[in-house]
Design a protein with these regions (language model features):
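Basic, alpha-helical terminal appendages of large translation-related enzymes
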Residues: 1-7, 33-34, 64-68, 72-75, ...
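N-terminal Rossmann-like or analogous alpha/beta NTP/dinucleotide-binding catalytic cores
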Residues: 1-110, 204-205, 209-222
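Active-site cores that bind ATP or allylic diphosphates and position pyrophosphate for catalysis
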Residues: 99-242, 249-254
Length: 268
């Protein structure tokens, strides 16, 4: 009896890739919850949130229980960050993206992003305190090595198979920054626990995130869900469908006369 969730960000209208993710979640859960991941105030808009509800209703996908809106739970994420800080598991990082990219021979993580070299992890505590007091812009990063010592060896469950965890492959992941009070990694993992999600379904592009999320679950004492990742829908050039690249929206398909059944078939 699995509880799944569909968790889009209201940063644009849904496209066929979202339809696949939603149908996959509903198909594999006896209960499927809806969560709006709207922690990026610069990109998320109420009109897009309303559009998500409209598209799901058109596809006859009715979520179980109330919709969880992440921007309404910022205090919960702050409490998690404070708890991690008290245990010495997060630290302020003052490096810019340009600093990280410019690091000599900077390797890349599973998500393709340059790995953080750890410069601020070992910063002199007095200098760190001075920069914080001055109000210097910074992010909060998870000290992955310290968290792994606390958690010990970990595995996660993917389609019934145990997979060894390698969260160190991500480097010290950002858990919060000034323009985002908490990161996707922290919010999604926290909310899956709070909402009682037992099966996390999502696209192949997020498979590697399970390693980091399992570490967060272990250090926070959150339940461990099962994971199941689905293939991505690709465009004619072999790239995954995305809002940024102007993928055709479900609203546009509806206005062009496609039926829900036709969209469902295309999304499979």
């Amino acid at each position: 009896m699995a509880t799944t969730r569909f968790a889009p960000s209201p940063t644009g209208l849904l496209h066929l890739g979202h339809a696949r993710a939603a149908l996959f979640a509903w198909r594999h859960g006896t209960r499927c919850l809806l969560r709006l991941e709207d922690i990026d105030p610069a990109r998320c808009q109420p009109d897009y949130a309303a559009g998500i509800m409209e598209d799901l209703a058109w596809l006859s996908l009715v979520p179980h229980g109330p919709v969880r809106v992440q921007s309404e739970h910022l205090k919960e994420y702050r409490a998690v960050l404070d708890g991690l800080a008290e245990r010495g598991l997060v630290y302020p990082c003052f490096c810019t993206r340009a600093d990280i990219v410019a690091s000599a021979a900077a390797p890349h993580g599973p998500d393709g992003a340059p790995l953080y070299p750890g410069a601020c992890r070992t910063m002199d505590l007095g200098l760190r305190a001075d920069r914080l007091a001055r109000g210097d812009r910074h992010a909060l990063r998870l000290d992955v090595a310290a968290a792994m010592v606390l958690a010990g060896p970990l595995t996660y469950s993917e389609a019934g198979q145990r997979v060894p965890c390698r969260p160190e492959a991500f480097g010290d992941a950002v858990l919060a920054r000034k323009d985002a009070p908490a990161s996707y990694h922290l919010c999604a993992t926290h909310d899956d626990a709070v909402q009682g999600v037992t099966l996390v379904t999502r696209g192949e592009d997020l498979r590697a995130a399970a390693h980091l999320h399992r570490l967060l679950q272990a250090v926070m004492g959150w339940p461990e869900p099962e994971y199941l990742h689905h293939p991505l829908l690709l465009d004619a050039n072999g790239r995954r469908l995305s809002k940024r690249d102007g993928a055709a929206t479900l609203r546009g398909m509806r206005e062009a006369g496609l039926t829900p059944g036709e969209v469902r078939r295309r999304a499979r």
